[in-house]
């Protein structure tokens, strides 16, 4: 907990120190963000990480290396009305 506190304090000092030297808030914020980071790059990375529909409709669910077929694919449940 103490480490998190000191990290927070140091980040506050790191952000506010340039302001005391006459810097503008926008310049300080821009200094924290990499130059090559653009909204298009962020959107592209989010889209590439999204799961495709094929992954969502997968027929098997595996838990602890034990894979069970999905309910709609189990043949023993069909016709038991």
UniProtKB/Swiss-Prot annotation:
Modified-residue entries (4-hydroxyproline), positions: 69
Entry's family note: Belongs to the conotoxin C superfamily. Consomatin family.
The UniProt record lists the keyword Protein transport: no
Residues making up the propeptide: 23-57, 71-81
Description of its domains: The cysteine framework is C-C.
Keywords: D-amino acid, Disulfide bond, G-protein coupled receptor impairing toxin, Gamma-carboxyglutamic acid, Hydroxylation, Secreted, Signal, Toxin
Gene Ontology terms, MF aspect: toxin activity
Note: Consomatins evolved by gene duplication of a 'Somatostatin and related peptides (SSRP)' gene expressed in the snail neuroendocrine system. In addition, this peptide adopts nearly identical conformations as in the somatostatin drug analog Octreotide. As this drug, it contains a D-Trp at the same position, whose synthesis is a common strategy used for enhancing the metabolic stability of compounds in drug design.
GO CC, one annotated term: extracellular region
Name assigned to this protein: Consomatin Ro1
Signal sequence range: 1-22
Function: Moderately activates human somatostatin receptors (SSTR) with a specific activation of SSTR1 (EC(50)=2.9 uM) and SSTR4 (EC(50)=5.1 uM). In vivo, does not cause behavioral changes in mice within a few minutes of intracranial injection, but causes a progressive loss of movement thereafter. Four to five hours after injection, mice recover, even with the highest dose tested (5.4 mg/kg). Shows antinociception and antihyperalgesia activities in two mouse models of acute pain, most probably by acting outside the central nervous system.
Primary localization class, coarse: secreted
Disulphide-bonded residues: 62-67
Record-listed 4-carboxyglutamate modification sites: 58
D-tryptophan: residues bearing it: 64
């Amino acid at each position: 907990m103490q480490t998190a506190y000191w990290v927070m304090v140091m980040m506050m000092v790191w952000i506010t120190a340039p302001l005391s030297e006459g810097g503008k808030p926008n310049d300080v914020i821009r200094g924290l963000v990499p130059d090559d980071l653009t909204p298009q790059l962020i959107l592209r990375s989010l889209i590439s990480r999204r799961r495709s529909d094929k992954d969502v409709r997968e027929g098997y669910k595996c838990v602890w290396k034990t894979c069970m077929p999905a309910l709609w694919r189990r043949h023993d449940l069909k016709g038991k009305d």
